Amino acid sequence: MTQCSGMLTTEPPKKGTGAGIWATDMADRFPTAQVIGTDLSPVPPGMQPHNVTFEIDDCCSEWVFPNDHFDFVHVRGLFGSVADWPKLYREAYRHLRPGAYIEQVEWSVHNRSGNGTLSPNHTLAKFSQNAIRAGTMTGKTFEIAENMAGLIREAGFEDVVEKRFKWPVGPWSTDPKLKEIGRWNLLNWEEGMEGWVMAAYTRVLGVGLYFY
């Protein structure tokens, strides 16, 4: 939200809902809307508003909703999780009403430095290399951030807009907004790293937990 100046979305159900925070916030922000969040795992019960529901479902399978059903589909953070992205986008297209929107937010797995000093042997560079290799081996790409705009167009969507943002890792930036983003992004890395790499490294790449 800091990146988008407090907006939950850049356009007026959530796929891959995780803990359900985004879906809950959207339901709070738009009390007349009906928000549905789906994920493979159940969302812990809490103080969700009355207009949001969470369902256990696989977005990679055929969607169980009627055609032309949704006004908006939001997809986030599914890099490395989807084997057939074109199918997922076709399902979204089929279940959106004419004139409706799809929005997807993904993180690039390619870590970069602003001055080009990130060497191939740096831990963050090796993380990128290993993620790409694991995605190739499983058929579930980690590079969807670089390819999603083209694939969404191929699914039939029109007026596709791609926006790219710089997210620092840590509060090192002198820009107040980037400093705040970096602080949250560092927390995201610290809390998310185990979930990102544990299965990929041990089950796919066959390396130990103390690989580095």
Feature roles, as predicted:
Residues G80, Y101-M198:
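Conserved catalytic/acceptor-binding region of the Class I
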Residues V82-D84:
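Short N-terminal helix/helix-N-cap motif within the alpha/beta-hydrolase-1
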Residues P86-Y101:
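A short glycine-rich, Lys/Arg-flanked "PGG" loop and its adjoining helix->strand segment in the class I
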Residues M193-Y212:
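C-terminal transmembrane module of eukaryotic multi-pass membrane proteins
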Residues T17-G20, L40-V43, C59-S61, V75, ...:
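Conserved beta-strand elements of beta-rich interaction domains across eukaryotes
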Residues T32, N51, G99, F157-D159:
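A generic structural signal for alpha->beta connector loops
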Residues H69-G77, E103:
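Short SAM/SAH-binding signature in class I
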Residues C4-N67, F72, K87:
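Class I SAM-dependent methyltransferase SAM/SAH-binding core
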